[in-house]
Amino acid sequence: MNNKKQFSTQKLFRNISVFKEKDFLTLHKIIFMNFWTRISRFILKNQLFILLTIGVITVLLGSQTKYIKFSYTEANLLPEDHPENLNYTRFLNVFGEEGTLVVLAVKDPALFTPEKFNNWNQLAKDLEIFSEIDFSISIGNLNALKKDKKNKCFKLVPLVEKTFNTPKEIEEFKKHLFDNFPFYNNLLFNKKTQTVQTALYLDDKIVNTKIRKDFIFDKLNPIIEKFERDNNIDVHISGMPYVRTLNSQNIKAEMGMFVGLALFVTAFIFFLFFKSFRATFITLLVVSVGVIWAFGFIGLFRYEITILTALIPPLIIVIGVPNAIFIINKYQQEVKKHGNKTKSLQRVISKVGNATLMTNITTAAGFATFVFTNSQLLNEFGIIASINIMAIFVLSILIIPSLYSFMPLPKEKHLTHLERKWMSKTVNWMVRMVRNQKIAIYTSALLVIIISIIGVYKIRVSGSIIEDMPKDKLFFQDILFFEKEFGGIMPLEILIDTKKKNGVLKLSTLKKIEKLTEAIDLIPDLSPAVSVNKLVKYAKQAFYNGNPKYYQLPTSQEKNFLLAYLKNTPESTNTLENIVDSTGRYARITTYMKDVGTDKMERIQERLQAVIDKEFPSEKFEVTLTGKALVFLRGTNYLINNLVISLSLAILLISLFMGWMFRSLRMIFVSLIPNLLPLLVTAGLMGYLGIPIKPSTILVFSIAFGISVDDTIHFLAKYRQELMANKWKVRTSVYNALRETGVSMFYTSIVLFFGFLVFIISSFGGTKALGGLISVTLLFAMVSNLLLLPALLLSLERRIANKKTFKKPKMQILPKKEEE
C-alpha cells in the first residue's frame, strides 16, 4: 500500500515537473499572445469609443498647457544639499541676490558731444524711475566722495550738476572723470578705450519672475531703441538677467520651429517611402496628438520649459513615426497576402504590438535613467520624455488600426513600395555581405574601433553658462563686447568671514583683501574686482581732497582719521552696504568672468585658492569662492559624472531586459556589441571634431543607445522565430530575418536620422550638437545592426544557436507561426 502511494506521489510530481518544463512557456505564450489577441478584438470592436476617449483626453491635456511657463532662472544642476549650493545660499543670505545687474554701454566718440552726452545722462535718469529697478549707477547720477571738514565726515556730491553746452565742457569733464576717479575705472568707464557704462540693478524680488521679462521687452528695450534712433548710436546691453530673458525667448521660438520642421521632414520621408496620402495623414494625426499630450504633461506636472524639455515635443514626433512605419508596413504586408481588412488589422495588433511595446520600453528606459541623476533639470526631462514615449506607443496602437478599420483597403499602387527593386537590391546586398564578406565586416569594425579609441583620447571636458547660446544673436555679440571692454558678465563672488564684528575694517584684513584683489586683477579672464579695500582707498583719496595719487590703503595713523570720518558719515551716504554687511563681519569681493570653459575655470579657482590659503589663515577667516559661474562649474562636473552613471545604468537595464526576453547570456553580449560600437564611434568623432563632453553632448549616448537597441530587438525576435521554424538552421534563419526586418529597420533608421538632423539648424550649440551626434550614432547603429549583428550570429552559430544556450524566451515577442 505504501509502495503504491509512493509510486503515485512520484508519478504526480513527475507529471508536475513535465508540465513545468513543457507547458509553462506555452502557458506563458498563451497568456501574452492571447492578451494581444484580446486587445486587437477590443480595438476593432470599439473603434469609435477609443477615438472619442482619446479625443477627450487630448482636450483635457490640452487644457493643461495654460500652466506651461518658461524658466526665468538658470538651471541649477546641483542637488539642493550639495556643498556648493549651501555656500551660495549662505552668500545670498548675507548679501542678497547677486545676479541683478543689467549693463548698458556705448563705445562711440560721437557720444562725447553736448546733445548726445546729455541724452545719455538723461537715459539713466529715465530708467531709474521704473519700480523694477532698485538703483542705478551712471555718469549722469554719479556722486563723488568729498571731505566735510566742518562736520568731520564724508558726503556725496553730484559729479554732474548741469547739462553740457559745449564740446570743451565735455572734454574737460571727461578728462576729470578718467584721470581723477580710478575707483570707477572698469566699473563705469574704460579709460583706455573711452567706453562708458551704466549699471542698472534690478529689484531682486522680480529678477527671477515673469515681471523681469515684461520689463525688458515692454519697457527697457523700447527706450533703448528710441535712444539709438534719436542719437544714431549703438547701445550694447548685457548682464545675466538680460541674457537669460533673451535666451528664453529664443528657446520658445525654436521649440515651435522644431515641432513644425520635425513634422514636415518625417512626414515627407514617410510619404517618399509609402507613397500614400492616407498613411501619411494618419501618421501625422498620431504624432500631432502625441505633441499635444507632451505639452499637456509638461503643464500637468507644472514643469517649466527649459532647453531640454523644449526638445520633448519634436522628439515625440521623431520617435512616434517609426512606430507608425512598423504598424502600417505590417498592415500593408498582410493586405497584400490575403486582402482581408479585419484579419489584417487583427494580425497587425497581435503580431506587431508586443515587439513595438518592447522597443518603446527600451527607448523609454534610455530616457528614464536621467531620473537617477539627482539633477532637477534632468529628472524632469527623463520623467516627461519616458512618459510620452510610452504614450505615443499607446496612441499608435490604438489610433492607426481604429482609423484603418473605417477606411477602404489600400490600393495596389500603395503596396508597390513593398517590392521596390532598389530596396530588394539593398537587402540582397546586405545578405551577400553577411554571407560572403564576414572578414571584411570584422576588419572594418576593428579599424573603426581603433580610429575611434584614438579620437576618444582627444576629448576634453568643458562647458560654460553661455557656451551653447546662439552665437549669431545680437545679445551674444554684446556679451563678447562686455568681455573685451569690462572683463565679462558672469559673476564670481568671494565671501570673507572675519569671525569678528567689524573685523573687515581692520587694516590687516584690508591688506589681505588687497593682495587677493591684486591677484584677481592679474587674471586676464576676470574683470577688476569690486571690494571694500578699493572703497577705503577711495575714501583716503577723498580725505586728501580727491588727489588720485592717494588712491591707496591708509597707513595705521591715517586709518584712525579715516575711521573717525567714516563713523560720522550719515547713513544715507553709506557706500559700504553692498560690499560689507551691517555688522562689519562679512565682506564680499565681486568680479566678473569671461566665457571660459570649465577646464580653465578650474585653473582660475586653483590660482585664487592658493592666494586665499596663503593670506587668510583658516583659524581666523573663512573664505568661500561662490557665485553663479562657480555653481555652474560644479554643476557641469557633477552632471557629467551622473550622466556617465546614467549611461551605465541604461546599458545594464537594457541588458537585463534583453536577458529576460531571450534567456541567453551570450545573446546579451552579441546584442550589445553592435549597439556599443556606434557610441564609441560618436565619442571618437567628438574628439576629432573638437566637440567637448558637456551636459548637452553627453545626453547623446543614453538617448541613442535606448533608440538603437530597438532594431536589435526586432531583428533578434525575428531571428528567434526563424530558428524555431527552420529547425535551428542558423544561416537560413539569419538570412530570412534580415530580409524580413531589413526594410523596416532601414525605413525607421532613415526617419530617425533625418528627424534628429533637424536639430542641427538650432542656434543653440548644445541642441545642434545633440541632433548631429544622435543622427550619426543612429546611422552607424543601423549599419551595425544590419551587417555586424547577423555576421556575429553566423560566426558564433555553434555557441549560441542551440537549444541549451538559446532557450525559449521568457516573453514571446513575435508569434511562433506567422501564418497562423
List where the protein language model places each region.
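Signature of alpha-helical transmembrane segments and their immediate interfacial
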Residues: H28-F70, S402, T416-I465, Q477, ...
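Juxtamembrane segments of multi-pass membrane proteins
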Residues: M433, Q437-E558
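Hydrophobic, glycine/alanine-rich multi-pass transmembrane helices and their short helix-loop junctions
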Residues: I269, L357-I400, Y404, S655-G659, ...
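Extracytoplasmic
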Residues: T89, N118, F164-F277, K511-E514, ...
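Hydrophobic transmembrane alpha-helices and their membrane-interface caps
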Residues: T280-I327, M667-L716, L757, S784-L787, ...
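Hydrophobic alpha-helical segments
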Residues: A294, I298-K411
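Interfacial segments of transmembrane alpha-helices in multi-pass membrane proteins
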Residues: K252-I305, F372-Q376, I645-G690, I761-F764
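Pore- and gate-forming transmembrane helices of large, multi-pass membrane proteins
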Residues: M255, L284, N323, K336-T373, ...
